[in-house]
A protein has these predicted regions:
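Flexible, low-complexity linker and terminal segments
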Residues: 1-21, 146-373, 378-379, 521, ...
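Short helix-loop-beta junction
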Residues: 50-57, 259-271, 506-512
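Conserved thiamine diphosphate
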Residues: 120-175, 203, 207, 211, ...
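Short acidic, glycine/serine/threonine-rich loops at helix termini
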Residues: 47-50, 74-76, 97-101, 123-130, ...
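A glycine-rich helix N-cap at a beta->alpha junction
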Residues: 58-64, 107-118, 196, 200-201, ...
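Thiamine diphosphate
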Residues: 1-149, 177, 241-242, 315-544, 550-556
Length: 622
């Protein structure tokens, strides 16, 4: 059996060592999950990886949808038929899905519907670190936050139970450290999946016309009030200290750091851990703060709990002193660690930080390392050709907008590709709106998966308004950055020529754009020609730069027993450094004044052997 099959088939009581995301997937399967949908995004991707691998054996439907909004709509539709359904995404994906989510909150559901958001404090792989707990307030939906992989598995089942009992979607929030930490998880029996029920007709069921939505708003508020009255012990735990002066309230991964600080330094602090952050368990909180005159609140990102607890104490005339983010005991940005939590706790308690003597003298032990594209990455060839074309056309100052994906790394030297990079699909709209773009041409980069996700409306807008931009769609045949997931253009990764795959060329031509060419970026001459010609176009021109992701290609080459490596003919090499300075492949370096290729890193793409990279053609097959 495969690793994922082991997770699926684990028996009741068996203990597994799982990622938080894997525990969530196992918990969903235990809950009788029938349908799941997602658009991949770190740090949520491993949930989809597991479902993609085992969905047939689990007798459930799983799909990678074109974007998060569609994924939620698909899962919602299944839930209206009584099936337990789930959608999951990274935190910024909630922005995309929120349009549908706000209305679905009003209509409610029938089968359980869980909406998982994986937040990314410290922006490990994201363009912001928004705190999606606020979506619970905005949508009036329950919010559940686990602390450990075991809780992640157990709480997902509770989320389905609450959703189904109250006919309401439930938001399930993790963070990077919860999703990607490993821990021991004891599994439970798998529930039988519910059978599809007949759809109950009636426009007032799942219709958001104002006359129905106005009634549903009151129903939604009643649901939240009923859940609030529940205050389930499953989501609340209290750890009592010997003394009553100090108490702490925490949730999510913040609790884990707090627990370790208290244990390591033997602090006398009672702790209230909250697993459901909306609706807030006000009775339990009031009881706790009244028992402790001094309260420390530990939570990552925004003072979400703190603001509510302060307001509650003010309303109920509780005079406990609160120490948190709002009075600068803890930072408002980035993820926490044990040092940050220890520092805040000791500051609140008026104790000397035991590690304060090291502050100001710490220095990085490793030299800064700029992220780079993989050896053999087709994006490197595309960037190289575009930079050369811009130079030849005297357009080196042209504005370049980029998008979300591996190719975002083009912003680093030597390519400097990406004056703008904002959000999924934004590159085309931005390029169309750059001042002067009506007369001076811009260049736009977007990946294949991102193009399908949200780039098409921008392209239609560019055509409608005759934007003077060259759009380069970097089609590496896979959603690469999040872990090699398929997308509409590569539904079958084993057969990239399958008729099931949606043609980017046909989509682009369907907008009315005539200037559409497809080029292999490894052929630098043809790529350079295509880009140069596109600059002569009136209106938008599209170049589809198509070549498999190096990781995807390498897996196939390894399976076939093929591997080509290039080397440098030192007699031909002039030591000009152009292959390193301009092409920036991590396999190439300068050793003893000559170029040198590391055979362990060389991918065998051969692009560096072309005269555009090495004018002396000193790079040859080993």
């Amino acid at each position: 059996m495969s690793y994922y099959e082991d997770i699926l088939k684990a028996k009741n009581g068996q203990v597994l060592f799982l990622l938080g995301n894997e525990a969530i997937a196992r918990g969903a399967i235990e809950s009788g999950l029938s349908m799941a949908a997602s658009y991949p995004g770190t740090p949520s991707s491993e949930v989809g990886d597991l479902f993609y691998a085992i969905h047939e054996k689990a007798k459930m439907h799983f799909e990678y949808s074109v974007n998060e909004k569609v994924a939620l709509e698909v899962a919602f539709a299944s839930s209206t038929l009584g099936l337990r359904s789930m959608v999951f995404m990274k935190h910024v994906g909630m922005n995309v899905a929120s349009d549908a989510m706000m209305s679905i909150a009003y209509t409610g559901t029938r089968g359980g519907l869980v909406i998982m958001t994986a937040d990314d404090p410290s922006l490990h792989s994201s363009q912001n670190e928004q705190d999606n707990r606020h979506y619970a307030d905005l949508s009036h939906l329950p919010l559940i936050e686990p602390t450990t992989p075991q809780e992640a598995k157990d709480f997902i089942t509770l989320a389905f139970d609450i959703s189904e009992k109250y006919s309401i979607p439930v938001i399930f929030r993790t963070t990077t450290m919860i999703s990607h930490e490993r821990g021991l998880v004891q599994v439970s029996p798998r529930m039988d999946q519910k059978r599809m029920s007949n759809f109950e007709s009636g426009k007032d069921m799942f219709n958001s016309l104002p006359q129905f939505a106005s009634r549903n708003k009151k129903v939604l508020q009643e649901k939240i009030a009923n859940i609030k009255a529940l205050e389930s012990d499953r989501f609340i735990s209290v750890e009592r200290a010997d003394e009553d002066e100090w108490g702490a309230i925490s949730s999510g991964v913040g609790y884990a750091y707090l627990h370790d600080v208290i244990a390591k330094y033997k602090l006398s602090i009672s702790v209230l851990k909250i697993g459901m952050s909306n609706p807030l368990p006000e009775k339990s909180i009031l009881k706790f703060v009244r028992e402790h005159p001094r309260i420390i609140i530990v939570e990552e990102l925004d003072p979400y709990l703190e603001e509510k607890i302060r307001a509650l104490c003010e309303l109920e005339n509780v005079d406990s002193i609160i120490y948190g983010k709002m009075n600068s005991y803890f930072p408002n940005d980035y993820e926490f660690n044990m040092d940050i939590v220890r520092s805040g706790v000791f500051k609140a308690m008026g104790k000397e930080d035991p590690n304060s003597f090291t502050k100001g003298v710490e220095s990085p032990l490793v030299a800064p390392r700029t992220p780079v594209l993989c050896s053999g990455c087709p994006h490197r060839a595309s960037f190289f050709a575009v930079r050369r074309a811009l130079k030849l056309a005297g357009m080196e100052d042209a504005k370049i907008s980029s998008d979300i994906g591996c190719y975002s790394l083009g912003a680093y030297e030597p390519f400097d590709i990406g004056d703008y990079m904002i959000s999924m699909g934004s590159s085309i709209g931005i390029a169309s709106g750059i001042p002067g773009s009506a007369s001076k041409r811009t260049v736009t980069f977007i990946g294949d998966s991102t193009f399908f996700h949200s780039g098409i409306p921008g392209l239609i807008n560019a055509k409608m308004n005759n934007a003077q931009t060259t759009l380069i769609i970097l089609d590496n045949r896979v959603t690469a950055m999040t872990g090699q997931q398929p997308n509409p253009g590569s539904r079958d990764l084993d057969d990239l020529d399958s008729k099931q795959n949606i043609s980017i060329e046909n989509v682009v031509r369907g907008t009315g754009i005539d200037s559409v060419v497809t080029v292999d970026p490894f052929n630098l001459g043809k790529m350079l020609h295509a880009v140069t010609e596109s600059f002569k176009t009136d209106g938008p021109a599209v170049i589809i730069s198509r070549r498999e992701c190096a990781i995807l290609r390498d897996a196939k080459e390894k399976k076939a027993g093929r591997h080509v490596v290039y080397t440098v003919n030192t007699e031909k090499c002039s030591g000009c450094d152009k292959c390193v300075e301009d092409f920036a492949c991590p396999a190439i370096s300068i050793v003893g004044g000559k170029a040198s290729i590391d055979p362990d890193q060389c991918d065998g793409c051969g692009v560096c052997s072309q005269r555009y990279v090495c004018p002396f053609q000193a790079i040859e097959v080993a």
